[in-house]
């Protein structure tokens, strides 16, 4: 992680964790050491070959990680390897953008797909089951898991769904102004987000939440001894984004993640809007950008 920090001091904490994890997993998969930039450069051909099996959407992030890691190496091969990685990454970005414009589900997303109505039905059934539990003074381990799932889904469904990181870093107590937390100001409850993927660009975000969600969080604070909103399966530490995803997979019995939930939410909300590719093609034919085209639309 030190190399990433030294090479890119402005990298967010989330990106540092992601890049460090990518490098460790890559070394494990290739069964080689990738502890230094020079070792990455040494094994660059093996890495490139290995990454051919990775979808462009994921590969571009792995390549960005590798470029940051080796970019200040004194090796004579650094420039050539960076050029190779960057060319592949730019092709992946182009291909990914093309796929995004098509607005088609990946095979993995198709496996996890549910309608918003189906998701809300599961949530409603869970709510009925845990309502008596939320009134208890203390929970068993199993009861805790059920209630925690209810809290998580409440956060994802009662307001527009955010990424996993936003809630794995959310604190119930012992927080500072720089933490993700709930704030009640002039009797109005808010979620405050400081740690999230695009925080460097947008800064602190304040999301007004419904009273129902605020009540759920207050009740949960009394039942959950941890300072964090969500605990891992052993209830010994805060949950990680990967563990949160696994919780959702287990509950819905399919690969439904926060990412897919965001797709489902937006697809339902904007279901009457024309396809993105069609809108871009029309804007191009009219000689202006998509942004300008949207400004022309009057409702």
Which residues does each predicted region cover?
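Flexible interdomain linker/hinge and immediately adjacent N-terminus
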Residues: 79-136
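Basic, Lys/Arg- and aromatic-enriched nucleic-acid-binding interface segment
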Residues: 116-164
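Conserved tyrosine-mediated DNA breakage-rejoining catalytic core shared by Y-recombinases
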Residues: 131-137, 169-211
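A short, glycine-centered helix-capping/turn motif at helix boundaries
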Residues: 145-146, 155-174, 272-276, 286-288
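Active-site/catalytic core of tyrosine-dependent DNA strand-transfer enzymes
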Residues: 206-265, 270
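Short, polar N-cap/turn motifs at the start of nucleic acid-interacting alpha helices
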Residues: 254-255, 275-298
């Amino acid at each position: 992680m030190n190399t990433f920090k030294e090479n890119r001091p402005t990298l967010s904490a989330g990106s540092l964790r992601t890049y460090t994890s990518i490098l460790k997993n890559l070394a494990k998969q290739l069964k080689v050491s990738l502890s230094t930039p020079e070792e990455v450069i040494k094994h660059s051909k093996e890495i490139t070959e290995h990454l051919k099996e990775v979808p462009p959407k994921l590969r571009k992030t792995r390549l960005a990680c590798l470029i940051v890691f080796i970019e200040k190496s004194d090796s004579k091969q650094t420039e050539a390897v960076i050029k190779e990685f960057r060319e592949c990454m730019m092709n992946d970005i182009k291909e990914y953008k093309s796929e995004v414009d098509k607005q088609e589900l990946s095979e993995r997303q198709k496996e996890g797909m549910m309608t918003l109505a189906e998701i809300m039905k599961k949530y409603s059934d869970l709510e009925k089951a845990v309502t008596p539990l939320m009134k208890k003074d203390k929970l068993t381990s199993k009861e805790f898991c059920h209630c925690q799932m209810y809290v998580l889904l409440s956060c994802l469904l009662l307001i527009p769904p955010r990424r996993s990181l936003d809630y794995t870093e959310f604190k119930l107590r012992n927080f500072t102004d720089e933490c993700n937390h709930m704030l009640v100001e002039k009797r109005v409850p808010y979620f405050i987000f400081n740690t999230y993927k695009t925080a460097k660009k947008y800064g602190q975000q304040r999301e007004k939440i419904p009273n129902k969600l605020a009540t759920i969080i207050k009740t949960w604070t009394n039942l959950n001894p941890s300072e964090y909103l969500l605990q891992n399966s052993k209830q010994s530490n805060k949950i990680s984004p990967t563990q949160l995803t696994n919780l959702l997979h287990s509950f819905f019995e399919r690969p439904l993640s926060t990412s897919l939930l965001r797709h489902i939410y937006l697809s339902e909300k904007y279901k009457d809007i024309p396809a993105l590719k069609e809108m871009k093609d029309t804007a191009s034919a009219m000689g202006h950008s998509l942004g300008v085209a949207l400004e022309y639309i009057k409702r």
